[in-house]
């Protein structure tokens, strides 16, 4: 938790550091937060006998931990490859057609996803799919409009920026295995689709 009380990491197979199935970790330097996280991950129990709150069965098993330990030395190289692909997208003129991810001066992006913005995101996704290039909008319906959570939103809640981001975002191909030729092909396909 360098920036807050705790930090979370997902090790889902599609993430930058993947395990074989679902997995994750929480880091903190707060003993009370650490105790609560440990309790929640084991059904809400501190001692396997008394359940003091409703929890989950969310322990990282030894096989997943072993896979992560084997893959961890690859992470820096994979992240460098993702950054190189992102740099190539930007250098190739992609920004002439879509809004690129904005750099943050105090951080170094590892580009789990490469998300661009366009008022024609759905049209662009269809054009890329026709060329065999995978691209998608991940969060088209914002959480305050999802059936399971809409009841928690205050009546009349308007989040125009959130709704705009949901409509206009599109994740382009990204990963450490992405080649320069694939990046160039995607940039060319975006240019052709959006003119």
Place the predicted regions along the sequence by residue.
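Conserved beta-strand and immediately adjacent loop positions that scaffold enzyme active sites
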Residues: 16, 23, 113
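Conserved active-site segment immediately N-terminal to the catalytic lysine
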Residues: 1-20, 47-52
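PLP-dependent aminotransferase class I/II
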Residues: 29-195
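Short beta-strand-to-turn element immediately C-terminal to the catalytic PLP-Schiff-base lysine
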Residues: 2, 10, 24-29, 69
